[in-house]
Amino acid sequence: MHFAKIALFTSISMFATAPVLAQAPQIEKNISMAMALAIIQGTIDQCTKDGYKVSVTIVDKGGNVAAQLRGDGTSPHTMEFSRLKAYTARIRNQTSLQTMKELEDPARAPLRQIPGLVGVGGGVPIKAGNGTIGGVGVSGAPGGEKDEACANAGIAKVEAALK
């Protein structure tokens, strides 16, 4: 009899809690291919106008490369460096220039242990509302501030879609 009560209680508990455990699928914003290409084009246009030859990388919400372009006449290292800058901006939810300034503080030294994190300007997070959905990394202009200005120009091309 005691076993029957336990079995009945267990069965009722399982059926009563099943609907509570069921949840709707999670829906997240992310970078589309069209958006990535528009950002790259806007970035390249600005840097070309300013006289810089750059490479540009767009990473998605997960930090994975969504699109990458090596500009004409750029050094080979600019592809990887632009990826690292984009990744840094994405995972830190701030510009890589801000990360560079943070790393100057000895108390923030443990940040240097994060694989793929770089403290050099040129990476800008792509934000949609309050969330970060990707990052842009630019490498090749003479200085991270100039790379960052080009990245901001690229993001401005898709600003309406990010609201």
For each feature predicted by the language model, list its residue ranges:
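Bacterial N-terminal signal peptides that target proteins for export
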Residues: 1-8
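N-terminal signal peptide c-region/cleavage motif recognized by signal peptidases
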Residues: 16-19
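Flexible, solvent-exposed loop/hinge segments and secondary-structure transition points
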Residues: 21-163
